């Protein structure tokens, strides 16, 4: 509310974000004209409207902390694991079908432990899982 009547800028913008359940967001609004003419109610409506149209036009992303993992399995196990993987929050980065099947996956922290346990169980331990770097990636396209 820097330079504005108290409660007429920051709180209305924050209310828009809260109602849309958005976090880790920054909205900057610059007003050039109309403070005295608009009055307190007009300022609240102006700032709220600005935040709303900004949110409407923004691409909303679901950023998740995740781990890049590499999986190597025999062809005999691939059908089973290809059934399991989509049940978790996973992005397939690449797949290579050579002597073995090698998959590079991004797995959310919430899914990683259970997914890896299930992959080991379903493959009877005939799987290699390599944990790589931890990342922060957009999982908006992944259905929960």
What are these regions (language model features)?
Residues 23-34:
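Glycine- and acidic-rich phosphate- and metal-coordinating loops
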Residues 74-78, 108-113:
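Helix N-cap motif at beta-to-alpha junctions
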Residues 88-93, 120-128:
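A common structural junction motif
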Residues 97-110, 131-144:
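Short proline/glycine- and acidic-rich turn/helix-capping motifs at secondary-structure junctions
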